[in-house]
Amino acid sequence: MEKKTNKNKGVAEETKKKVAATTGFIIGQFIRFISIYYAPLYVALGRPHTITILALPYLLIHLFWNTDKSFFAYDSKKLNSIRNLEISSVFLNHFILQLLNSCILPNSTLARLITIYMFRCNNKILFLTSSFFAWFIGQIFMLNSFELVLVWIRKKNYLRSTFRNYLLRNSIFVILFNCLFGSLLFILSIQCLGRIPSPIPTQKLSEVSKIEQRERERLQSEEERDVEKKKPDYKLPDSESEILQKNESETPEFEKHLAALLFDYKRWTRPFRYIKNNRLEQALRNELSQYFFDTYQSDGKNRLSFTHPISLSTFLKMMKLKIPLLLVEKTLYNPLDNGWVSRNKKQMNYRRIYFLNRVNNLDKAVALPRIQFETTRTRLCIHNDETKQEYLPENYDPLLTGPHRGRIKRGLLTINDTLTINDTLSEHLRETIILNRLHALVLLNTNSKNFNQKMYTFEKKPLEISDFSTLSSNLNLTDPDQKTEFLVNPIETHDPNFIRKYIPIEEIRKNAPRWSYKLITELEQISYYKNPPEDHDIRSRKGISVVIFDPTKEAATTNSKTNTTKDTNLETKNKSKSDEKLVVIRYPQQSDFRQGLIKDSMRTQRRKIFLQELFNANVHSPLFFDRLRIVFSFPRLKQIFINLSARHVFGILKSTDKQTKRKRTKKEEKGENKRREQKERLEIGEAWDVFPLAQIIRGLLLLTQSFIRKKIILPSLILGKNIGRILLCQIPEWSEDLQEWNRETHIKCTYNGIPLSQKKFPENWLTEGIQIKILFPFCLKPWHAYKPRTSHYDFCFLTVWGRETEQPFGHPRKTPFFFEPVLQELDKKIVNIKARIFSKVKINLFKRVSKENDFQIRKQIMNESFRQIEEIPSCTNSSLIEKMRNMSDRTRTIKKKIERMTEDKKKVTLELYISTYKRSYRLALSKTICKMVKVLIWKFSYFQKLLNQRVYNDIFLYTIYICRMTTQLFLESTKKFISKSILKNERTKKRININKETKNKIHFLSKLKTSKNCKKNLDLSCDFSNLSQAYVFYKISQTGVLNICKLISVLQHTVISFFIQTQIKDLVHTEGIFKSEVIHQKLQWPKTSQWKNWLRLNSKYDLSPIFWFSLISQKQKWRNRVTKYHRPKEKYLNKWNSHGKYRLSDYKKQNVPKSVSNQKDNSKKCYQYDLLSYKSINYEKKSASVLYRSTPKVTKGQAIYHNDNMSQNYLFAITPNIPGKIKRVDIPYIGKNLDRKYLIWKNIHFSLRKKVDIESWVAVNTSSNKDSTIGNYNYQLIDQIDKKEKELFSLPIHQNTEINRPNSTNSLVDWMGMNEQILNRPITNLELWFFPEFVWLFNVYKTKPWIIPSKILLLNSNLSEIDSQQKSETDSETDSQQKNIAETQKYLEEDSTKSDTKKETELELELFTKKYFLFQLRGDQTFNKSFFKNIQIYCLLLRLRNRKKMTLSCIQRRKLNLRIMPSMTNLLNVPEFLKRTGLVMDPLPLSIKTDGKFLLYKIVGISLVHKSKDQTNKKYRKTRIIRAVENNHLDVLVLENILSSRCRRELRTLICFNYKNWNGVNTTSIFCSKNCNLFWEERNPRQNDKRELIQKFIWPNYRLEDLACMNRYSFDTTNGSRFSILRFHMYLPRKIHG
């Protein structure tokens, strides 16, 4: 039963809540509906005080209700529903929410629409009833529809289940819903709080009576002061004050009730803005609306006007109430209505007739006379019953002259209707003016009792004599000046003021609604002399008053100085002056939004303000948004888009913009700069005003800066300058500097920069700010010279940082530099010295130019003659006449060129012989001097580099050379003395002879020709019987650069080469001047050498003077040569040519210094391009490159040398040699240290005490003697790491023992040209003093950084030695290969026996280091700099012998950190150490390519073919394929594998047309002899040649062209070196069978 009762109670409560909600909703909607039709209720609901009473409590209650429901928990067991708080809250909730609909969501158009509908409906009661029923039906329909939807949801169980399961049970949704609803209510409550006025009563308004009283008191005080000047007392008319008092007294009691304060138009608070009125009247109340509408008659019909003035409608309503009382018998009828319609009809008929007449006249063919049409104008007329229509005068007709608010009332004048302006004033004054009836009607109060009595009675007072007295008093002219002005000046007849006074024109006036109070500003409050108001009402702009002049302080100072006995009159004067203070108001530039606002006024909600940024200093309206300077404006975006996109698309827009842009003059630019600077200064000043304590800090800083400047800095500068002058033996300038220092004065100024005085501070300077102005600022100068000081530098302002500015808060100006005049004097002297030097150098430069012109003429003649000789054989098929023509044309062209070059030479040389008195000479000389100066300025950097290089060569190397020679002579003398004392005389003589033959001294072309060795070598040249062609060549080479070039051009001639000795040809051939084909070619086959001529023209040759010096030193030995294959054992000609320091090209190109980095980059690019081209050519060819060359028979262990030493930039591409195992590793280039240009000597520790094999450094010539033996000159450049001392950080890089034997002299490169220097180097301790080998190696390595020897960076591996010569020699190369394989097997067996003795740990470490070359360190800790420093010191200690001493010294110097070092208590093995410690070395395996095992080896061999022509690795020796020899003819070398890839295409085109003439080469080559072993090819050589021709010329030609096109398209380059980027293949190479 209890459960049933609870259920029934719950159902009853739910029904009661539903009923309460529906009733509250309907009642609220009903009141809202009534408020639409009843204006007072609508206004009451929209007032801000209703928001304070209804909205704010409602929202706050809901906010607390949703947050804490226990606050409203109320358990009541009573059945009365009214007392139940929940039901009443539901009712109020729905009721108040409907009333607040207009407050929360206000809609201004709703009220306007309702009033329009009410106005349009004639039957308003029917409209109200119909609209009410429609509203009621709509409300019911809406409620029912909501109920149906809710019932349908309840019936659907799955919707209820989902709602309960997911929403109600899940507390997150409930919390979110409550939070959202609560936050929304909170936002609405805050918005309402911003809109509502504060219910606290504010200060009382300044009423009009108080203002009038203050004004009267002020005027009375002025009259008392100025007694002489009598002024009338200005009083307000009694009418306005009486009306206001009457209105206040007659207001009903209902309006004074407290409840009416909510709806009072005056409000509790004041309006937002105040319309200031300069008169004594109050401010207007702006309550007119532009949307007011009313009816008016137009064309006899009532029409609706939406812009009808509200004042006119109110006036008509007032008239309707009062006119029936006056004129009851008359009805309101407008007789002009019918006339308006009839007049419009007449106008239409007249226009129709007029148009028809014009059309008829146009149709007539006869010439009509001139028709005069009358012009009609609408005029305003007066229409009465008594008088007919009379037009107004033109001056007063508004249809002609414009609108006039007034009308002439002639009927109201009683005496005479035709009064004119010329009538006398007395006649006007006699007549009485009838009062305006409308005015009387408006003033009448219908509610008063005396209304009927005053209906028709108008008071008429007669004129009095006093009126005329006032007129006569006004016309009294006492001054003679006034009389003359009154008589002479003309009188204006059309004066509007005169017309207004004496012509009775009544204007329609209306007393506008005004506020009952008058507000004042702060300035008006200050302006009151007596009884000023307590506070101002309107906020004025924030300003700071700065007192400029205070007479009280000056009076106090004057009184203290003067005697005390003075008159009291002075004291009274001082008192009167004490009130007169000069004050200047300083306004900040920052925006003040409170300016002009009324205190305690309600702020408006700024809904239509556009916010551009996060913080806006100024508020902008959307109306003026287009005038703002926006960052992302259209013209700026267009400019950016033009720069990014194609120029031709927006070319028209850009051109139009340029045309429309105005050219800025210098004045405009200066003005813009000034405005910009002024803006910046104002911003800085405002920044100091923002913070409260900023002005105090700034003022104190300025005072400290002025004290430091005046008392510390400037005296110290003066002291330092004069002490310096005394030290430089110059006269000090104490008096001048002190005079200028005393002249500088610091004046305190206001914040705006107005100067006050030197000692006094402005008032409130700590809060308002201060400036310090410096008059005649001190400027330190090195010496005093008379210069008039400009006014620009007479004053400045001091900044916070102690610098000078021209204006307050301006940019600091540049102070003159102290050493500027000193530098100017030095510049003048330097210019004079340069002029003297250049005048001397001028003549030498002219001479050089003349010599160069001579050389160019001769060289061009020689080249032209050679071209003629070369091109003659091509004309064999032509006729004799054509040959003669060609010859004549060529001779003409050569003659013309010679003439031009001689004229150019004359232009240069004849300028020296022109007379100095001619003007042309002076002009030409000035032009040449200017050109020379420009060239010298351009080449100044090159001159500087050459100067540094000369200093290095002449001083540093000179000292090294002297020290080395002295030590060498000393050691040689000691050796000779010891050898003489020990051995016998005969053995000593033999030893000396042997030493002379085997010794390799370092030969320098030094400039010190006075040395002993140079004298000995030069004395040998006096014997003319010993002269040879080599000595002649050497002497010619010593004459100069130009003669060497001539020598090359002469030697390259085909005829002269036959008269040179064969030995000289071989030696010159090694330097690249001659090729083997050119030297030993047949004379009767010149047409087979077209490509040789091309090579000769395109190649540049380097002839080193050291090379020729070696030739002349060995001229005796060359004459005693037995066979032509003999080669002196000591001298290796390659090393002189590889030396790049003393090459002839360095002397030839002194003005064009080379950059080693460019050479390295070019070599790398060339190498990459060669690799790509070689891959494309020999893609399927797995064997080595085919080389066609004669192989001479050589001894075992001797290399065949062939030197084609050409510069890598011209013909031959020199690529780096790759160390290590070539079979195992295939690395095109390791990109780890690409930026390293030179060898880093810090990475290698040099010592010459130990020995290591350096036979790989020594190069052997092709013409070597059988009996010549090459010894092992074992000196070590790199420290050897013993196997016993190998530890964790030792890193030996192993090489393949089978490829490079230690005893084999198969060297590829004479590295750095330092073999002779190091082989004959004595083992002494003096080498570390001078480091001669460092200088030598470094200089040579700089010239050719890309050439690396095969064993320079490989540590010694203690390889076993093999004898250099063997007894048995084989006749074929196959037998030698078998023997080499057997030797390698033996060597491997020996290595295996040695390796068995090693420990297991050492073997693992060696295998680890053999497999990997690079390591990286990783650890579990962050490494500091000290940790890496310790590692560097450990590595250094591992290389040293005396480690203990070095460790102790490092510990003493605190370079080793003992905390980082591990403790030595537990000795661990290497693997255990690596496991336990955090530092681990991880190997980095090198990149290994499996495709193409010999690809890299082939490329390197091709690029170094001039170094190792016939040398191959012993393990991978390949048979050389030699073509068939027929009739002692041998094919030449295939240049496809020698030349650089850039020259191959041009060479193929020349060879392909001369392919059949290859058999015309001479067989008497230096490489062909009886001792040569020839290897025959098993296949037919001609078929192979065809295949190679097609593969190497035709197919790669097209293929590389495709790659070039792709390269240009994809990478926008035309350089062939970029081909290394393209790693893809367009086509596969074709297989040609045949």
Swiss-Prot record:
Locations listed in the record: Plastid, Chloroplast inner membrane
GO cellular component: chloroplast inner membrane
Region ranges (Disordered): 216-242, 1365-1395
Pfam families: Ycf1 (PF05758)
Transmembrane spans: 25-45, 53-73, 94-116, 133-153, 172-192
Coiled coil: none
Organism superkingdom: Eukaryota
The keyword Transmembrane helix is annotated on this UniProt entry: yes
Keywords: Chloroplast, Membrane, Plastid, Plastid inner membrane, Protein transport, Transmembrane, Transmembrane helix, Transport
UniProt membrane topology term: Multi-pass membrane protein
InterPro entries: TIC214 (IPR008896)
Family: Belongs to the TIC214 family.
Assembly, per entry: Part of the Tic complex.
Name of the protein: Protein TIC 214
